Amino acid sequence: MVNYFIISISFFLLEHFYSFYLNFRQSKLLKNLTKVPEYCKDRITQEDFKKSQEYSKAKLDYKTLTSTIQVLTTLLSFYYPVYPYFWNLSLELAEKIGYPNEIIRSCFFFAFTVGVSVITEIPFSYYYQFILEEKFGYNRMTRTLFIKDKIISTLLMIGFGLPILSLAIFIINWSGPQLWFYCWLLLVAITLLSITIYPTFIQPLFNKFTPVDGELAESIFALAKRVGFPASKDTIFVVDNSKRDGHMNAYFYGLFGTKRIVLYDTLVNELDKEELLAVMGHEFGHYKMSHTLKQMLLVQVHLVTLLYAFSLLINDDQLYQQFGFVSSKDSVLVGLTLFMFLYSPIDRIFSLLINIFSRKYEFQADDFAVELGFLNSNHLFKLHFKELGCLVYDPLYSAYHHSHPTLVERSNNIDKKVALYKLKNK
């Protein structure tokens, strides 16, 4: 007999203990680093460096604390059968309203688990936003906006989650052994639909998007024309992130006819035109090399693997009984919830692989910007320092957690590409 319960708990603890070990390595590195690293000693003052170290340490301590609490609450939820309790309560409610079928019962179960997750997360996100971020001058969010965001995001989660869940349960019960294939088709359809509706209907609920204009717009459109990006007032936007915090970012997303580049207003206000164009050159690099599509394909491989493995275990009564449920006839949603605990090591492996490709894509986008004639990394340093970004990372910690290369890795890569560019264009 396979003891799924012991395997799941062991994997869960192993993953978190390794994460704690990496946090310890990173914390020790930060503690021992008292002087500005050589690669940026002429770019940052000792005072700003010290503040950066304090911010990095505060975030790391926060991460360690929240992970510790997550481990304890998860173990307690297994020791005291919280999930079976919610499942039985869901049946009672479904019977009271006269619809004790699996879909209605699963919708109640989903609502309970989402509700508990949202409520227990609020103190941590509040602390992070209004204490940690406030301490270092980044918080600009009001408590009213904080509450509004939580309400809207929860309603969206339930509003979209319940219909998708109901459809998924129907498909799984209908499709039998081929459930992995039909569920994958459903997820592909949902992904493509979300890419279409997210920028138009979802994002405006949280932020205001203004088309880029003026001299900056003319320069960006000229650069876009050089690289073949279909730029217009409907594809490049400035978002009012400053109403939430002082952080800066730019990102490209979308496929087919929904391609967009978004610049934070904090970024536009902080960088000069040439630096902003260098940022745009990087984002255009993601577009030209189809990084969004490639990442989406990687995610599909992950999903197919997950769904196929789930199809092999969904009818195994041992999986359910070892976690306090009656049998595999309980629910598709219960089976998926339990399976995700068991699947966590494979999920982590895929996350690491996706990080490897993501880091590679960042280097490629930087290379593309160099080929456009942006021959330094000043904008990266400026952004990093304004963000009080960590200046040194333990290599194991970075490889495990980061989807982007570190500042020194990107800077060194750009310097090498600039040298080659200058040789080629003498």
From Swiss-Prot:
The chain crosses the membrane at residues 4-24, 71-91, 107-127, 151-171, 179-199, 295-315, 334-354. Its cofactor is Zn(2+). The keyword Hydrolase applies. Its EC number is 3.4.24.84. It catalyses: Hydrolyzes the peptide bond -P2-(S-farnesyl or geranylgeranyl)C-P1'-P2'-P3'-COOH where P1' and P2' are amino acids with aliphatic side chains and P3' is any C-terminal residue. Proteolytically removes the C-terminal three residues of farnesylated proteins. This is CAAX prenyl protease 1 homolog. It comes from Dictyostelium discoideum (Social amoeba). The gene is zmpste24.
